[in-house]
Amino acid sequence: MIEQQFLKQCKEKAYFIEHQRVLLAISGGLDSMTLLNLLYKYQKELDIELILAHINHKQRIEADQEEKQLKEIAQKLGVKILTSSFSGVFSEKSARDFRYNFFKKVMQEEDCTALVTAHHADDQAETIFMRILRGSRLRYLSGMKDRQPFGGGELIRPLLEFSKTDFPTVFHFEDASNFENTYFRNRVRNHYFPLLETENPRIKQAIINLGTEIAQLQKALSDLTKDLNQTDLQTFRKQKREVQVFLLQEYLEKFPDLQLSKAQFDEILHILNTKANYHHYLKNQYELIQDYQTFKIQKIGPKSDSKKDAILLQFEDIIELDNFCFSFGKELVGGVVQMIPVSRKTSIVLRHRQSGDRIVLNGHHKKLARYFIDEKYSLQERDEAIIVEQFNEILGIAGIVTSDLSKNSKRDIMKDILYIKKIDR
């Protein structure tokens, strides 16, 4: 029965109308083998050509044999299959990143315009519930979308409206690790949901319905605010805070790899409402640029000679810049020039001087330009000086001076050290 429902849904939602070569992610489990059977059966009706992609995670002794069998199945079906083996330290995140990077690579090499995965309704309920437990923002409780941009094409999840109990019995591999509670998703699936189902046997559907309502609410708010210019400061500041939050969240959707914390989001909101002509470094090599009329977020470009260039240090990063080695939290041996107290709660910005820079020295704010003049630094030395900034405050200048803000032991948040070592080149 699922076959006809599946075909009907694919046609009604026009999943493949713009796609000819389709990449199917296949693990060998019941979900992906069911999807393989469905897409293979309806290739002509959907006017698609299938290509398979499989990742061998190398975590079970059966993994190599399963990869071999999948290749044999693909050969019998006359479908091309490409495989890759995971390498590195295994975790849920590292494995997921490896998979999707491989899928992007295959899509490009094989000229595929769509990646298809076998996520289903049970996965959707688990995902929403996991996000609730992690304290995700409301918009992310809408769950996975059945289609979204991916790898220059589209990611399609055509089984999201089907429960695993709807799947027919087909040849597949059973992964014994799915029954172990080492990973968060397994604990949700094997422990939390069975407990919740004793209170409400339809808890999964209730969670999915909640996600659907949230998605509808987000869509309604988006439609109601579509005529507002999100990046016009005058328009933005006229809105109530609740509307500002929504507008900023909508704008940040354009940068999926930015991943701001709530504190970082609130900091941007504060800047947009109080600052003018402002330049603020975020994370993951993004920056916020604000003038008197508008603001924008953009990726920081490759390093050049511009004084506006900046480098972001995350906790435990070690880098060499000009004539210095900077180590965030890891002690350097020998020849340490400076030790600046910092916080691991956000990144450190290394940059050159900017107009209006101020530093706290001897208990007073002092213009950086005046400090350089008083200390008789040459113009070249001023231009080459590396500013250490965190929480929008200058904490020091590499090899020159440390701000009182950083020295002040009463700032309990500054419990880590940025080590700066002079390099002889």
From Swiss-Prot:
Cellular localization per UniProt: Cytoplasm
Biological process (GO), any one: tRNA modification
InterPro entries: Lysidine-tRNA-synth_C, Rossmann-like_a/b/a_fold, TilS/TtcA_N, tRNA_Ile_lys_synt, tRNA_Ile_lys_synt_N
EC number of this enzyme: 6.3.4.19
SMART domains: TilS_C
Pfam families per record: ATP_bind_3
Catalytic activity: cytidine(34) in tRNA(Ile2) + L-lysine + ATP = lysidine(34) in tRNA(Ile2) + AMP + diphosphate + H(+)
Function recorded in the entry: Ligates lysine onto the cytidine present at position 34 of the AUA codon-specific tRNA(Ile) that contains the anticodon CAU, in an ATP-dependent manner. Cytidine is converted to lysidine, thus changing the amino acid specificity of the tRNA from methionine to isoleucine.
Domain notes: The N-terminal region contains the highly conserved SGGXDS motif, predicted to be a P-loop motif involved in ATP binding.
Database matches in NCBIfam families: lysidine_TilS_C, lysidine_TilS_N
Record-given protein name: tRNA(Ile)-lysidine synthase
Highest classification ranks of the organism: Bacteria, Bacillati, Bacillota, Bacilli, Lactobacillales
Gene giving rise to this polypeptide: tilS
